[in-house]
């Protein structure tokens, strides 16, 4: 009996040692490639309380491990840190000038002088990866390995089995890209941009799905949201006996040369007051091309400096001046929470003057900066930001966002899911995910 106890004690200590050795967590190997056609794929997503950004546990390698990665709507591909504790029986590094390198749109050859390991081989392809928070870049090795994700038929809240992509392309990026800006313990970034080897495009290609994905980001760190790959509006119509997709409004979606998702905003109104007079709406401030980027790499809306100044002025005019208090960094306009019952709503008129309206409620804009002080969660992006308007995670949370890449359009909920009595965390049973 003593020898058995010693055995189990040693086994327990071994597992504890392995857990602390790596941020990646092993998972049970229950996965399959079903014969039934796959309608949808689901990746659970969590809200990081300290940053307001969203991350997911990707299931990769052989044996499968959970790898925590930031969700980057505009990223070109998946990149992970391979320098520490990357162990897999199925990792491969495609040779330079191979078809995999062409698919990844890279023709740069890379050779690592050290001993071979994931991320370090001779005569492979180099792929540039970016930390979307700091914009720092680094060159890494193009690799391929197993990726697993939950399948579902969309008619149930239960997640289906794990299905696999045996040779999923990604970058083994240098570890210094993880040093700043990312949530704690993150080991990489999952790019959802419209690029050849982004997560949505590889999944659609491998499983024969529609080139479409839906985001439902949870506002609450204690519940999970989801990324849904495939045609969710036609496969998830009924939820609690109601069609949660019925109030979607669509607007044209453009993709920049960098693979970023942009929409056109025709005008901005605060409590029906125009931020600019009508004859200036299409000026370079808002931009004839729209200049509005949808992003998950910032929690707050970001405006070009001139637009920010006009926006905050009109917003402040809608509230009593005596309610304003000293601003709390990094915010520029703050209020005494006890003196205000309701905050103005903001309407973004999409595409053209009579286009669909994206309404941003006070809940989607305001941030409690400290006890008794609530601030406008809109940031000054300076004179030359990446886009005149950037919509952040606060504007995307608790809404259905459908990125229909095949039709070059994006659908957005014209009301919060809360109006249906549900949250993003209710869409699926994530208990075992």
Curated annotation (Swiss-Prot):
Domain Peptidase A1: 54-413
GO biological process, one term: proteolysis
Source organism superkingdom: Eukaryota
GO molecular function annotation: aspartic-type endopeptidase activity; nutrient reservoir activity
Classification via CDD domains: xylanase_inhibitor_I_like
Pfam families: TAXi_C, TAXi_N
Keyword Ribonucleoprotein: no
Listed InterPro entries: Aspartic_peptidase_A1, PEPTIDASE_A1, Peptidase_aspartic_dom_sf, TAXi_C, TAXi_N, Xylanase_inhibitor_I-like
Keyword Signal part of the UniProt annotation: yes
Gene3D superfamilies: Acid Proteases
Signal peptide: 1-24
Record keywords, A-Z: Disulfide bond, Seed storage protein, Signal, Storage protein
Biological role: Seed storage protein. Has a protein kinase activity. Binds leginsulin.
Annotated family: Belongs to the peptidase A1 family.
Quaternary structure annotation from Swiss-Prot or TrEMBL: The mature protein consists of high- and low-kDa subunits linked by disulfide bonds.
Protein's recorded name: Basic 7S globulin 2
Phylogenetic lineage: Eukaryota, Viridiplantae, Streptophyta, Embryophyta, Tracheophyta
